[in-house]
Design a protein with these regions (language model features):
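Extracytoplasmic/periplasmic ligand-capture domains
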Residues: 1-36, 40-216
Length: 218
């Protein structure tokens, strides 16, 4: 799958100029989310504390080092529609992941396969916001096809996992709950839930511990 490498996912995120889009299209009405429990006491705001480090210790070898050394923030651009610094970072990550430029196209250094994917949108949606994203990806040599389909096709393709990328809304609870399992557990990989297709023993273990703790609290 095109998004199986974390460096590719990070590079594509760097190409998404939220600051420009928010200013030019939405009158700065939106704010960026950097935690699943945004604006609650459970939001991730700092480095893991002592209790969290105890939970994470058995899984440390399976986690990116950044979990312990960096406070997560989404990429921030200059908001001018062309953030050269972010695109250079994205280019570096793609090269490290084995995706190189050949002419104007990003291809796999080993197989020659082009780096391309499809963005699936509901037929009724406004695609204005994704066109600048598509243009930024083109600067990196990545082709993103935008395809609109009706709601029944969206549902069918979700059930069969026949999609590369689509917009999703997570209506998260303001506190940890069993909803975490539905949204992120590998147990729900063959359903319309867990839309990103996350399959991680680490995430499964953490979710199970959270649910067990909720049970003890009640």
């Amino acid at each position: 799958p095109v998004f199986s490498d974390r460096r590719v996912r990070e590079a594509i995120t760097l190409a998404f100029d939220f600051e420009w889009m928010n200013k030019a299209l939405f009158y700065n009405a939106w704010s960026r989310t950097n935690s699943y429990f945004q604006n609650t006491e459970y939001a991730a705001r700092n480095y893991p504390d002592a209790a969290e480090l105890v939970l994470l210790a058995p899984m440390k070898k399976d986690l990116p080092s950044e979990v312990f050394t960096q406070i997560y923030q989404p990429p921030v651009s200059k908001g001018d529609g062309y953030d050269r610094d972010n695109l250079l970072k994205a280019d570096k990550l793609l090269n490290e992941a084995g995706w190189v430029l050949k002419g104007q196209q990003r291809v796999n250094a080993t197989t020659g396969q082009p780096l391309s994917f499809e963005l699936l949108l509901p037929a009724s949606s406004n695609s204005q916001w994704v066109l600048p994203f598509q243009h930024s990806l083109q600067r990196l040599g990545i082709n993103m096809d935008i395809r609109k389909v009706d709601n029944s096709q969206i549902t069918n393709r979700m059930r069969s996992r026949d999609y590369d990328m689509m917009p999703r809304v997570w209506r998260a609870m303001p506190w940890p709950s069993s909803d975490l399992q539905i949204s992120w557990s590998s147990e729900y990989i063959n359903s319309t839930y867990n839309a990103p297709g996350v399959q991680s023993p680490v995430i499964d273990s953490l979710i199970n511990q959270i649910i067990a703790e909720i049970g003890r609290a009640h």
